[in-house]
Design a protein with these regions (language model features):
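Residue-level detector of short, conserved catalytic/binding motifs and their immediate flanks
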Residues: 88, 156, 214
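SAM-dependent methyltransferase catalytic-core segment centered on the flexible catalytic loop
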Residues: 97-155
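A short acidic (Asp/Glu
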Residues: 83-86, 100-108, 168-173, 197-198
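SAM-dependent nucleic-acid methyltransferase catalytic core
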Residues: 1-104, 116-129
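Generic recognition of flexible, low-complexity loop/linker segments
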Residues: 77-80, 145-149, 202-205
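Conserved Class I SAM-dependent methyltransferase catalytic core
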Residues: 133-181, 188
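C-terminal catalytic and target-recognition region of SAM-dependent MTase-like enzymes
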Residues: 169-221
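Structural motif
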Residues: 91-93, 159, 217
Length: 221
């Protein structure tokens, strides 16, 4: 608390990285380890106790001096993009499914804001009761929101990451992008996240076979 404000972001970034590692989850914040209904480090089987309970140590960051200007916004991207200048390249990584990030990573927000007065409600994960979904989390609105985003992006190139398990079918996503320029589709080798250690091997293999990650590079014309 005595650290000058200009230095706090550097240490806070390091702390958030460590908190995302040393926590009572499987590595994904969709649920916390429990023994029955009561939270317990590592759950009933004491999984990953070393990772969860080992001390947090902040390492010296790698800092790069450059003259690039950075702009950060919490606004709706579909609104914000209408007011940005012409850019060479824009990269988008929209939500793939119905689960908004905010309900998973709310604890990181608490650490980031360092608000000790936040009341954690008695919900499934302790997530805030006032969380909101993005249009990209909706099977009804995702496609139209995505097309509006591409149409309003003032950039020479647009790079998008998505997978074939997302709300927007890959064929539909390609059709939208091809309306606005020349499109290159790039397959990405990607090992899917092991959702839980107890999942059967055959189910895990099926999951790996089903999910394919892609990059889409659009040269907007």
């Amino acid at each position: 608390e005595t650290l000058p404000d200009k230095y706090k972001p550097f240490l806070l970034a390091l702390l958030l990285v460590e908190v995302s590692i040393h926590n009572n989850t499987s590595g994904q914040f969709s649920a916390f380890y429990k023994n029955g209904k009561i939270g317990q480090y590592g759950g009933a089987k004491n999984i990953d106790l070393k990772r969860i309970t080992s001390p947090i140590t902040l390492e010296m960051p790698n800092l790069i001096k450059n003259s690039c200007k950075s702009f950060i916004s919490k606004n709706d991207t579909n609104v914000w993009v209408k007011n940005i200048p012409k850019l060479d390249l824009v990269y988008y990584d929209p939500p793939y499914n119905k689960h908004p990030y905010s309900i998973y990573y709310f604890l990181l927000n608490i650490v980031n804001n360092w608000d000790k007065n936040v009341e954690i409600p008695n919900t499934t994960r302790g997530q805030p009761l006032n969380w909101e979904k993005s249009l990209y989390n909706s099977s009804i609105h995702a496609k139209s929101a995505f097309e509006e985003l591409i149409k309003n992006t003032n950039a020479t190139y647009i790079l998008i990451s998505y997978n074939n398990g997302g709300i927007i079918p890959i064929d539909d996503l390609e059709k939208i992008l091809k309306k606005y320029g020349n499109l290159e589709k790039i397959n990405v080798e990607h090992k899917t996240y092991n959702k839980m250690k107890g999942i059967s091997n055959y189910k895990r293999n099926l999951e790996k076979e089903k999910i394919q990650e892609y990059f889409f590079l659009l040269h907007k014309t």
